[in-house]
């Protein structure tokens, strides 16, 4: 084994000198396992980041360097950080190094481990067909459909329903498609991760999910690499098992933020707004591995924090370049009791074109957006002058727009324990048919409230019958 000694410690960045001229490669994992004089054991992993010359490498620690001293012996493992992959990861919670951090014991030693650093799939391996991923959530499937193997950005503030939407997507894909999900908490609040784990355990979704966390309190090295740990687990399900995998990353901004911290500690010259000069490269290396191949697909849903609501900030701007669809959650809609609170006018998708979704779906989606846009324009007039001042045509637009707005809401399976109402999965063809019939005026005589928090249009008719009885 190639051994060296610690020569300098600067917080999470540690320099190690190797004698004999044999240096570990970039990205190799180095380990320290020893006890201190006071009896506390130090068990650390570093990742090689730079070769400095004079037989010295600069490394980034994956956990706190408290108690580490100069002269400590360090061992080169000869390979990159490797994490468990395969069915043994399902229902479990891991840290960046692939160590289990739940209460179900260690992962068996014979479980296969893969390195977290690898190349994106070769050009000829990529799948060229664009296929829609049916989520069973009406507003998503109709107005901003997700692409299998695509990347989706989920924008929203605190408490507007990002987590519930994520859970429902995990649930629907597990139930309807038998799919597997990987959740990577990057720079997450520990409390949120804990809540998510317990909520998923209660709803039974956890059995089809692997979870990886690098929380806010961890060093930047761990927060920067934890997304790659989750991605490596997802890649195994895609490449070795031919699965269509869902990869959730919350929050992709924290990945960039951790990279910025590491870059400064490594002594690189900062670029715009203090970010790392390698921002676009690091983001590209992560995002290009998330794709569809001839074997299977990884569809990634990423929560995106926008610093100070500035979309021109280099971090969100770099993320935008990789996204195929955006789902915007709006607080105003939660106040109206419309869940999921997806903004139908601000959410976008590359897949919403007649060639991909079909002519009928495209036409219905555009008419829905036009009706809602017109309603939005009329709201000022209604607020000042009231409904009576509108033309008959505009009154009809408002009448239908309100029904559409309520019909975009839906009961979720994962929210059954709160609402007491059964969740619903709506196939795309039923969604398109329902909205088409509303636009044609088929249900103009039904009360507005019949459209609230329902699945298909049949449920609306049932609700209306009960109300009118």
Curated annotation (Swiss-Prot):
It catalyses: ATP + H2O + 4 H(+)(in) = ADP + phosphate + 5 H(+)(out). Pfam families: ATP-synt_ab, ATP-synt_ab_N, ATP-synt_VA_C. The keyword Metal-binding does not apply. One of its GO terms (cellular component) is plasma membrane. It is an enzyme of class 7 (translocase). Keywords: ATP synthesis, ATP-binding, Cell membrane, CF(1), Hydrogen ion transport, Ion transport, Membrane, Nucleotide-binding, Translocase, Transport. CDD domains: ATP-synt_F1_beta_C (cd18110), ATP-synt_F1_beta_N (cd18115), F1-ATPase_beta_CD (cd01133). Gene3D superfamilies: 2.40.10.170, Bovine Mitochondrial F1-atpase, Atp Synthase Beta Chain, Chain D, domain 3, P-loop containing nucleotide triphosphate hydrolases. GO terms for molecular function: ATP binding; ATP hydrolysis activity; proton-transporting ATP synthase activity, rotational mechanism. It is a peripheral membrane protein. Its EC number is 7.1.2.2. Belongs to the ATPase alpha/beta chains family. Produces ATP from ADP in the presence of a proton gradient across the membrane. The catalytic sites are hosted primarily by the beta subunits. HAMAP family: ATP_synth_beta_bact. PANTHER family: ATP SYNTHASE, ATP SYNTHASE SUBUNIT BETA, MITOCHONDRIAL. F-type ATPases have 2 components, CF(1) - the catalytic core - and CF(0) - the membrane proton channel. CF(1) has five subunits: alpha(3), beta(3), gamma(1), delta(1), epsilon(1). CF(0) has three main subunits: a(1), b(2) and c(9-12). The alpha and beta chains form an alternating ring which encloses part of the gamma chain. CF(1) is attached to CF(0) by a central stalk formed by the gamma and epsilon chains, while a peripheral stalk is formed by the delta and b chains. This is ATP synthase subunit beta.
């Amino acid at each position: 084994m190639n051994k060296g000694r610690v020569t300098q410690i600067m917080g999470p960045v540690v320099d190690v000198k190797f004698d004999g001229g044999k240096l570990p490669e970039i990205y190799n994992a180095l380990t320290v396992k020893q006890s201190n004089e006071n009896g506390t054991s130090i068990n650390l992993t570093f990742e090689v980041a730079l070769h400095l010359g004079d037989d010295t490498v600069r490394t980034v620690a994956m956990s706190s360097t408290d108690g580490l001293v100069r002269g400590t012996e360090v061992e080169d493992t000869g390979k990159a950080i490797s994490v468990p992959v395969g069915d043994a990861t399902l229902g479990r919670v891991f840290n960046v190094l692939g160590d289990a951090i739940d209460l179900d014991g260690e992962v068996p030693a014979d479980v296969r481990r893969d390195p977290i650093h690898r190349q994106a799939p070769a050009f000829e391996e990529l799948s060229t067909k664009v296929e829609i991923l049916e989520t069973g959530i009406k507003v998503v499937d109709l107005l901003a459909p997700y692409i299998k193997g695509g990347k989706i950005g989920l924008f929203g503030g605190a408490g507007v329903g990002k987590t519930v939407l994520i859970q429902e997507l995990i649930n629907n894909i597990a139930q309807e498609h038998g799919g597997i999900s990987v959740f990577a908490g990057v720079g997450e609040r520990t409390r949120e991760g804990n809540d998510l784990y317990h909520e998923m355990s209660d709803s039974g979704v956890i059995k089809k999910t692997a979870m990886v966390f690098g929380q806010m309190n961890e060093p930047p090295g761990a927060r920067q690499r934890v997304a790659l740990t989750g991605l490596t687990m997802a890649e195994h399900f895609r490449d070795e098992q031919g699965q269509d995998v869902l990869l959730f990353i919350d929050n992709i901004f924290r990945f960039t933020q951790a990279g910025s911290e590491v870059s400064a500690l490594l002594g690189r010259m900062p670029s715009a707004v203090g970010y790392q000069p390698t921002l676009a490269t690091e983001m590209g290396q992560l995002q290009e591995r998330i794709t569809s191949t001839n074997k299977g697909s990884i569809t990634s849903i990423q929560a995106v924090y926008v610093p100070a609501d500035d979309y021109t900030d280099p971090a969100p701007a770099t993320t935008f370049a990789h996204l195929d669809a955006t789902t915007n959650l709006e607080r105003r809609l939660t106040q109206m009791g419309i869940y999921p609170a997806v903004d139908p006018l601000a959410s976008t998708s590359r897949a919403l074109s007649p060639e991909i979704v079909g002519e009928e779906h495209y036409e219905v989606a555009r008419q829905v957006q036009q009706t809602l846009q017109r309603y939005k324009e009329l709201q000022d007039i209604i607020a000042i002058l009231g409904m009576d001042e509108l033309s008959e045509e505009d009154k009809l637009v408002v009448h239908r727009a309100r029904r559409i707005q309520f019909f975009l809401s839906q009961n979720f399976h994962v929210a059954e324990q709160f609402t007491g109402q059964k969740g619903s999965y709506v196939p795309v063809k039923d969604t398109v048919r329902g909205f088409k019939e509303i636009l044609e005026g088929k249900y103009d005589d039904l009360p507005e409230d019949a459209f609230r928090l329902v699945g298909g249009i049949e449920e609306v008719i049932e609700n209306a019958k009960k109300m009118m009885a």
